[in-house]
């Protein structure tokens, strides 16, 4: 008898070549370690309980001024929507394809979490953001990253000759992704080049450091390496000890690593939406109480008030947040009545309304890496919810 023809499963159709494409991403974004090397981040020994005080879907729908909330979330390719109000779980929604306990990649929200780690190491006296990168990493050359300060990395003001082009298939950005092991090897990159070697190869642009906001993910990956040197430990261990553990993160968490074990601090953190909400709530708690085991008050005040307004106004994202700013790897929505935002490609959001004590997490498997019109629409969506239920 002839064997029956075998039909490949949905999982078998996903590879390192296509894991960030939809529909593959509806599986891969919460199963990243099946495709990329990872390091575990230990969860808290004292997980934070989230009290439940739910609002109904109808209430949230009315608050957001939507005809149908489910339709909106599906249309915007949402995987999870979690809302905290005054520290309580107020709303929790999942797409059918996203199991509730799986960690989800948050892409560049990782940068903001890395910024929190930098703040904690600074508070401990281990990191000095005004020092040059080469003070921590002597192999970083002055004609490259060695000539900028750690604060330039934190604020996306390093003048480096690099183009953040997510759709690049032949240039420096695809070489960067191959170095992080997010893309399969190809002729676009030297054989066996790792992340640190790639970062060493980058050179300064014609501009000066500290003048203009220019969003470059390599800045944050290099920041992660600086933090390892300053904190005398691996990134994942430092993050668990100084940030996620004290904040009471309760679920499995991990970060992608390259072939040398270097963490992808710019975009590789995978965590549960409730734990991302705990990160946001930790910031609110620190503002309310003036102190927090993981988030120094001085770091929060510096983040809210010390950004370079001129650099932001002359930068590439000022159209999205015309009255905004960027400091310590966090977006500030409005300089007068600030909300803090952490944003990742393919639709990852952490929105913290400081005045109304609202935290909103939206994780997605959005087909496009960046959709500026949708980003603006979602900021209005978050703002409307916070104003209505806060």
Question: Model regions: which residues?
Answer:
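Active-site helix/loop module of the DD-peptidase/beta-lactamase fold
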Residues: 105, 123-166, 201-204, 218, ...
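Non-transmembrane alpha-helical segments in soluble domains
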Residues: 70-73, 119, 134, 151-154, ...
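Active-site Gly/Thr loop motif
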Residues: 250-254, 304-359
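Active-site SXXK
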Residues: 87, 105-130, 153, 223-227, ...
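N-terminal leader/targeting segments and the immediately adjacent pre-domain N-terminus
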Residues: 1-99, 126-127, 154-155, 159-164, ...
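Active-site-proximal alpha-helical segments within enzyme catalytic domains
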Residues: 156, 218-226, 267-288, 348-364
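Short, charged, amphipathic alpha-helices and their helix-cap/turn boundaries
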Residues: 88-93, 134-135, 169-209, 233-252
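Structured C-terminal helix/loop/strand segments within mature extracytoplasmic catalytic/sensor domains
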Residues: 1-12, 339-390
């Amino acid at each position: 008898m002839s064997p029956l023809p075998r039909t490949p499963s949905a999982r078998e159709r996903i590879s390192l070549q296509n894991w960030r494409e939809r529909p593959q991403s509806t599986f891969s974004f919460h199963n990243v370690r099946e495709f990329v090397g990872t390091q575990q981040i230990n969860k808290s020994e004292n997980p934070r309980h989230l009290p439940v005080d739910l609002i109904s879907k109808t209430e949230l729908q009315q608050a957001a001024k939507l005809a149908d909330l489910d339709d909106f979330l599906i249309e915007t390719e949402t995987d999870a929507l979690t809302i905290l109000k005054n520290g309580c779980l107020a709303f929790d929604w999942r797409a059918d394809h996203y199991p509730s306990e799986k960690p989800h990649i948050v892409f560049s929200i990782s940068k903001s979490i890395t910024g929190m780690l930098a703040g904690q190491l600074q508070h401990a006296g281990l990191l000095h953001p005004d020092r040059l990168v080469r003070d921590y990493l002597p192999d970083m050359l002055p004609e490259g990253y060695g000539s900028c300060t750690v604060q330039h990395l934190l604020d996306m003001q390093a003048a480096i000759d690099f183009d953040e082009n997510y759709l690049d298939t032949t240039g420096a950005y695809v070489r960067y992704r191959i170095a992080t092991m997010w893309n399969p090897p190809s002729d676009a990159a030297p054989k066996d080049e790792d992340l640190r070697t790639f970062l060493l190869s980058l050179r300064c642009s014609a501009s000066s450091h500290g003048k203009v906001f220019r969003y470059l993910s390599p800045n944050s990956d290099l920041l992660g390496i600086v933090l390892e040197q300053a904190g005398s430990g691996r990134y994942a261990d430092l993050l668990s000890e100084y940030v996620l553990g004290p904040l009471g993160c309760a679920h499995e968490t991990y970060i992608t690593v390259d072939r040398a074990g270097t963490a992808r601090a710019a975009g590789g953190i995978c965590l549960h939406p409730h734990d991302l909400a705990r990160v946001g709530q930790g910031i609110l708690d620190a503002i309310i109480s003036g102190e927090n085991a993981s988030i120094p008050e001085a770091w929060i005040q510096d983040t809210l008030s010390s950004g370079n307004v001129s650099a932001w106004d002359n930068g590439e994202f000022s159209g999205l947040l015309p009255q905004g700013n960027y400091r310590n790897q966090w977006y500030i929505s409005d300089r007068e009545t600030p909300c803090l935002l952490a944003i990742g490609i393919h639709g990852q959001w952490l929105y913290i309304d400081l005045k109304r004590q609202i935290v909103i997490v939206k994780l997605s498997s959005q087909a496009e890496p960046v959709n500026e019109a949708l980003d603006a629409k979602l900021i209005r969506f978050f703002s409307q919810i916070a104003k209505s239920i806060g």
